[in-house]
Amino acid sequence: MTTQIPNQDSEILLTMTNVCKSFPGVKALDNANLTVRSHSVHALMGENGAGKSTLLKCLFGIYSKDEGDILFLGKPVNFKTSKEALENGISMVHQELNLVKQCTVMDNLWLGRYPLKAGFVDHGKMYRDTKAIFEELDIDIDPKEKVAKLSVSQMQMIEIAKAFSYNAKIVIMDEPTSSLSEKEVEHLFKIIAKLKQRGCGIIYISHKMDEIFKICDEITILRDGKWINTVAVKGTTMDQIVSMMVGRELTQRFPPKTNTPKETILTVENLTALNQPSIQDVSFELRKGEVLGIAGLVGAKRTDIVETIFGVRERKSGVIKLHDKEMKNRNAFEAINNGFALVTEERRSTGIYANLSIEFNSLISNMKSYISKLGLLSNTKMKSDTQWVIDSMNVKTPSHKTNIGSLSGGNQQKVVIGRWLLTQPEILMLDEPTRGIDIGAKYEIYQLIMELAKKDKGIIMISSEMPELLGVTDRILVMSNGKVAGIVNTAETSQEEILQLAAKYL
């Protein structure tokens, strides 16, 4: 494919040329390039570990580049700190929101640069300026509200407003829709359109292809730290982008279904959670070797089902049976001992210990099995089990002692799944297992799910991605406002039928 650069008449705001960055044993960037124009949304794409975040951290002053040139507004720059980048017109909306939750919205917006009057903070001006920005961006939040009381999407709006307040020319957005509802995503896109109209260049990182093709003008693809291509969205297909990202053609998005569901292994009858609003009278069966999907709109209480089964959400009534034997599952420890495992939705906050090793993260759910009768840890067994996780899950890592936080999202998720497999579960529950994972790593997770189903595991998979549910599962349970709206055979259903069921009890 020939390189296409659209909008030749647009002003070039940023040029990064032949940027290199190495860490011990790893060349993270190898002559990477990026050109961003005014009035445009520029997608930066690549598999996890391709160098996207490293490139932007070199721009934003978090990392110092080893080689290469950065031109911003026609002048060479080499920002030493993120504060310097901000003050010069480059802003970043992080995936993990950097807000002080104990402070008010307006305090967060003007932190470190409060307006002063006679040597004191001018709260009136701060309020008025915040209100003016919010009105321009259609943000309906009280500037005096404590950040701790806001939703994730509202916090994200504050981060964007902060970029706006700095009069940023370049706004970097890293997976901005990962925790947003469909309505919130639409609001975000309207704000992006306003920033674009204002003359900003937006650098947009996302694994969601539909978003890229909806709001972006150009795409730069990185692979293994190298620049692969920059293309116009118009005239480029999804398959071409995927091929450039992974270095090969992905002929199928999903592996073939080679599992055979057998007899019923799990029965859930009239399950109701204690603290409402939550799930009410949820009933279903799961068979050995079956992948049961759970679909529903945001707020449908899909996660509440697996949390109640796993004992981390208290049960008011209902019965859970494994092999026709009733399971109390009063807490997670009891559930684990009974053969249940839960891979949680928010990998970064509840799934991994980012600053600890792969070994620790692999073994933490099964630590009791490494303690001898004398109370000593068996280092040999710990090392062999960690190696089993790395090998069987195909985790790409230099060492079992590597901090898990330094791995890509896909490799982190493989470690989490491997950790649970060490407990030898019969029921594996996966909540948004491919969220924030690139398309190549997603395929590996799908293959893993299929292999586990072939080994007669009962698998429950919650997903907000409809193609994923239709491509991986055998049946789909559809939730609507805490109730089961229907259970459909995947091979016989459609996206339209699932969406109709999802709206049944609204």
From Swiss-Prot:
The keyword Cell membrane applies. Part of the ABC transporter complex MglABC involved in galactose/methyl galactoside import. Responsible for energy coupling to the transport system. Belongs to the ABC transporter superfamily. Galactose/methyl galactoside importer (TC 3.A.1.2.3) family. This is Galactose/methyl galactoside import ATP-binding protein MglA. Its EC number is 7.5.2.11. Gene3D superfamilies: P-loop containing nucleotide triphosphate hydrolases. It is a peripheral membrane protein. InterPro entries: AAA+_ATPase (IPR003593), ABC_carbohydrate_import_ATPase (IPR050107), ABC_transporter-like_ATP-bd (IPR003439), ABC_transporter-like_CS (IPR017871), P-loop_NTPase (IPR027417). ATP binds at residues 46-53. Residues 14-249, 260-506 form the ABC transporter domain. It holds the Pfam family ABC_tran. It catalyses: D-galactose(out) + ATP + H2O = D-galactose(in) + ADP + phosphate + H(+); methyl beta-D-galactoside(out) + ATP + H2O = methyl beta-D-galactoside(in) + ADP + phosphate + H(+). Its main location: membrane. PANTHER family: CARBOHYDRATE TRANSPORT ATP-BINDING PROTEIN MG119-RELATED, GALACTOSE_METHYL GALACTOSIDE IMPORT ATP-BINDING PROTEIN MGLA. Keywords: ATP-binding, Cell inner membrane, Cell membrane, Membrane, Nucleotide-binding, Repeat, Sugar transport, Translocase, Transport. PROSITE patterns: ABC_TRANSPORTER_1, ABC_TRANSPORTER_2, MGLA. SMART domains: AAA. One of its GO terms (cellular component) is plasma membrane. The complex is composed of one ATP-binding protein (MglA), two transmembrane proteins (MglC) and a solute-binding protein (MglB). GO terms for molecular function: ATP binding; ATP hydrolysis activity. It is found in: Cell inner membrane.
